[in-house]
Amino acid sequence: NPNTNIDGMRTAKELGLATKDADATEIITRAQAVSIIHAALTNTKAAQEPPIVTEMKGVVKDLPQSAINDFYADMAKVPEPIRKAFIADGWKICFDTEKINEYSDKSGIYGIDGMTFYSEKTIYLATARSLLHEMGHYYQEKIKTTGIDRNVYSTFETIRSKEKWIGTLYSSNRQTNGAEFFADAFSYYVTNGIVRADPAGTDAKATLQSQEYFDELAAKGWLFTR
């Protein structure tokens, strides 16, 4: 069908799969057909970019190909007000194992998957799995500096001492202070809606202060003025 050929060629040109002067009436060879099909399969113009990818453009650097899906899936879990504040504040996320290894050598702390540098406004990641934990560090500092809770660090020191061993999540096993506890709790909460790792455990009937704290933040839109 000549009309079909013309319509098809026009679409191919729009997608960049054929040259602007290509003639739809010419018979193409099998090799040319294979070339066009391959271009169509690998063409990215036809695929709509996910909103979370568009939103984070210019924020994420050196994201490994193998981590793309996991990274954006977790970033989408971060409440939108926090993501927007992160971007507006000029923060960046860099996948930089060299930077992390240098820090490990200087500090003597090894096995680090992520770091949050407030002075640089940068989160450094070795793997995507640390994203939510590090975003928790950013958010806790934001809570303090915006005046939502200027005592959030001391508050979570107290909460950690009460809750660490009664079922609240502590995935890193490095909760030496309230900040690490907060970051772990944030990561678990935005993923599951709870901070308790085992809601059916022995503390199931206990009222966890950390749960109430995050429930209030979520109910008020995460970033607000007192």
Predicted features by range, described:
Residues 1-51:
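N-terminal propeptides
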Residues 51-226:
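Active-site-flanking segments in enzyme catalytic domains
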